[in-house]
Amino acid sequence: MGLLDSEPGSVLNVVSTALNDTVEFYRWTWSIADKRVENWPLMQSPWPTLSISTLYLLFVWLGPKWMKDREPFQMRLVLIIYNFGMVLLNFFIFRELFMGSYNAGYSYICQSVDYSNNVNEVRIAAALWWYFVSKGVEYLDTVFFILRKKNNQVSFLHVYHHCTMFTLWWIGIKWVAGGQAFFGAQMNSFIHVIMYSYYGLAAFGPWIQKYLWWKRYLTMLQLVQFHVTIGHTALSLYTDCPFPKWMHWALIAYAISFIFLFLNFYIRTYKEPKKPKTGKTAMNGISANGVSKSEKQLVIENGKKQKNGKAKGD
């Protein structure tokens, strides 16, 4: 007998039981959350983070429409300050995670979460919180693209990366602000020091961009990062590391999604035969702000790059 054929009382009992189970599960998950971070900014409830992410997606949708009949903003100085500010923030996070984990005697193979108020554990939790905040700040990458009318840079990879990182790391900080979580954040913040250094230098314009030949290796570095993440997480599962298994499996699935997306980007950008360029050059799908130039802005004369007209958006 199906649910629709059941007595009304039976249906209500099923619905009531399901609702009660959901409420109990919600209360249970909240009861095992990290007490150290519960009163930190943005951590009392998921709604501020979800609201910020929703506003971000609305801007991704409405921003290009608003800019359609407007001139792109000239943001060279803003981009230089922003990118090098992100270099400093990510270096701070990397340093705090490295020093905190070193002083706490963390293992890079397997490390459970210590929810105590030990000074090094709190230092690691705070650094991870700053890492989470940095992912919210990175929403500005997209804002700057749209204000500069670089809409071709706002790809699915770009939006997927930014929106999911900020949202999912709220979960990470709420329940596992320490232990194995330090490894991925430490590695990623170090890579972002390199990335934002590149973007900050590139924002100065064509006179320095010609020396930044290593752009393609940023994507390769990110691909290596995701493979290392999968290997490290798989090793933790193999050794039965006392860290939440659901987070291990979720991290593996998340890293695999990035491998496919970044590999697709890398092949399309660097491996496929180049088509005659009629617009803007390909850029890193994540946060290549301050770098792109249209072909009409740069011409090759006697082997040297020269400006041909005023560049917009830089």
From Swiss-Prot:
Membrane spanning stretches: 42-62, 78-98, 127-147, 165-185, 188-208, 217-237, 247-267
GO BP term, pick one: long-chain fatty-acyl-CoA biosynthetic process
One GO molecular-function entry: fatty acid elongase activity
Pfam families, per database record: ELO
Localisation per UniProt entry: Endoplasmic reticulum membrane
Record PTM: N-glycosylated.
Classification via InterPro entries: ELO_CS (IPR030457), ELO_fam (IPR002076), ELOVL4 (IPR033678)
Keyword Glycosyltransferase: no
Glycan-carrying positions: N20
Membrane topology: Multi-pass membrane protein
Keyword Cytoplasm: no
UniProt keywords, alphabetically: Endoplasmic reticulum, Fatty acid biosynthesis, Fatty acid metabolism, Glycoprotein, Lipid biosynthesis, Lipid metabolism, Membrane, Transferase, Transmembrane, Transmembrane helix
Enzyme Commission no: 2.3.1.199
GO annotations of cellular component type: endoplasmic reticulum; endoplasmic reticulum membrane
Region (Disordered), start-end ranges: 274-314
Biased composition, class Basic and acidic residues, residue ranges: 293-304
Intervals of motif Di-lysine motif: 310-314
Purpose: Catalyzes the first and rate-limiting reaction of the four reactions that constitute the long-chain fatty acids elongation cycle. This endoplasmic reticulum-bound enzymatic process allows the addition of 2 carbons to the chain of long- and very long-chain fatty acids (VLCFAs) per cycle. Condensing enzyme that catalyzes the synthesis of very long chain saturated (VLC-SFA) and polyunsaturated (PUFA) fatty acids that are involved in multiple biological processes as precursors of membrane lipids and lipid mediators. May play a critical role in early brain and skin development.
HAMAP family: VLCF_elongase_4 (MF_03204)
Family: Belongs to the ELO family. ELOVL4 subfamily.
Quaternary structure (record): Oligomer.
UniProt free text on domains: The C-terminal di-lysine motif confers endoplasmic reticulum localization.
Protein name according to UniProt: Very long chain fatty acid elongase 4
Organism annotation: Macaca fascicularis
Organism phylogeny: Eukaryota, Metazoa, Chordata, Craniata, Vertebrata
